[in-house]
Amino acid sequence: MLNFGASLQQASEGKMELISEKPREGMHPWDKAEQSDFEAVEALMSMSCDWKSHFKKYLENRPVTPVSDTSEDDSLLPGTPDLQTVPAFCLTPPYSPSDFEPSQGSNLTASAPSTGHFKSFSDAAKPPGATPFKEEEKNPLAAPPLPKAQATSVIRHTADAQLCNHQSCPVKAASILNYQDNSFRRRTHGNVEATRKNIPCAAVSPNRSKPEPSTVSDGDEKAGAALYDFAVPSSETVICRSQPAPSSPVQKSVLVSSPTVSTGGVPPLPVICQMVPLPANNSLVSTVVPSTPPSQPPAVCSPVLFMGTQVPEGTVVFVVPQPVVQSPRPPVVSPSGTRLSPIAPAPGFSPSAARVTPQIDSSRVRSHICSHPGCGKTYFKSSHLKAHVRTHTGEKPFSCSWKGCERRFARSDELSRHRRTHTGEKKFACPMCDRRFMRSDHLTKHARRHLSAKKLPNWQMEVSKLNDIALPPTPASAQ
């Protein structure tokens, strides 16, 4: 390493002499192409007037290869175990070109050297016993690596004798922020894991999801945004209590639509997850699980996706709507055992105690029984029983007083009906057609015809009237 530094020093002194001798010589046309290169070297050497005095101080702490930190040979760079604590951004050699892309150039230097030049130079100057230096071992979650063939300039650090801190070195500041972010995520993840161990199986299962670096901004990384997936059964209400709530809790309410779950007759419902921090006096975990009868089929619970900036360290209450399970209704059966239609109204059943049994009139009791052997008929009145007994004995006390008529009857109503046949009296008249009848049973039979005629069409009524008209007899034809 010391020989290489001495060679660099001799080369720089030779360049200084060449620059001082060049103006003395005559200017030739072929020197115009190299004029820009010499001016760039002269400006670069003038900016580092004190480099020679501090060269030995930085020589022990810097690698000998001018390869970029992010070149394709970063795994083969020489280094020592003591250099693991110093960011690689501060270990590049002095006077390296400024940040450039493959299509850009530096204002103070010539065109940027190619990657192949870096590779060959590093292979030639690489010591055999050096250990490879890996930046990924120091900061595994640092900012994403820069694209290939991009050099990093640290000319502003060559004049400093101090090591980089988090204020002057942006790489170290980014690593500290990422370390704080990782420690916060591990602490939050540990709290959730401890809470999950105390909750019954399949109650709450948080899963860390990996955020994509290309879609997460730097502001989100500093804020420590976390994404958790809580699978909460919709048939349970889980109350998780891990630590007391902070003095100034931050409430976060998110409306998340659960994914479509193909269940029989149960449509997917949106689930509202709201963080409600409550003061917890004791470190108990209480789980409220409603008991379901074994006859009901188990309802398929839709997973609930909870998203928030961070999980509070207090009590977390998840309120999940209960699934509606449509159980088949048993058919309605009447007291007599007859099945009723589901659309038919339910019959009204009156209680048996409300029924009032009507009192039986003592006068309507069939207390009069015929004493004739083998008869046993009963009657309400004694007169009816007396008339019945006359049928057994053959007694007819009522006789017709019409002149020349000697008929006798067992009942008085029969005698009255017989007398009308002699007189021609028609006591019973029809109120609709004014027809008269001698017997009441004849009038009743006639009234039935009027009741049936109301239900018939008009043409049938006309036909019935025509049938009532007696046709005149046809005259006998001459022989």
From Swiss-Prot:
InterPro entries reported in the protein's UniProt record: Znf_C2H2_sf (IPR036236), Znf_C2H2_type (IPR013087)
Alphabetical UniProt keywords: Biological rhythms, DNA-binding, Metal-binding, Nucleus, Phosphoprotein, Repeat, Repressor, Transcription, Transcription regulation, Ubl conjugation, Zinc, Zinc-finger
Cystine bridges: none
PROSITE patterns named among the record's database cross-references: ZINC_FINGER_C2H2_1 (PS00028), ZINC_FINGER_C2H2_2 (PS50157)
Entries under Gene3D superfamilies matching the protein: Classic Zinc Finger (3.30.160.60)
SUPFAM superfamilies in alphabetical order: beta-beta-alpha zinc fingers
GO molecular function: core promoter sequence-specific DNA binding; DNA binding; DNA-binding transcription activator activity, RNA polymerase II-specific; RNA polymerase II cis-regulatory region sequence-specific DNA binding; zinc ion binding
Location in or out of the cell: Nucleus
Recorded GO CC terms: nucleus
Name this polypeptide is given: Krueppel-like factor 10
Lineage: Eukaryota, Metazoa, Chordata, Craniata, Vertebrata
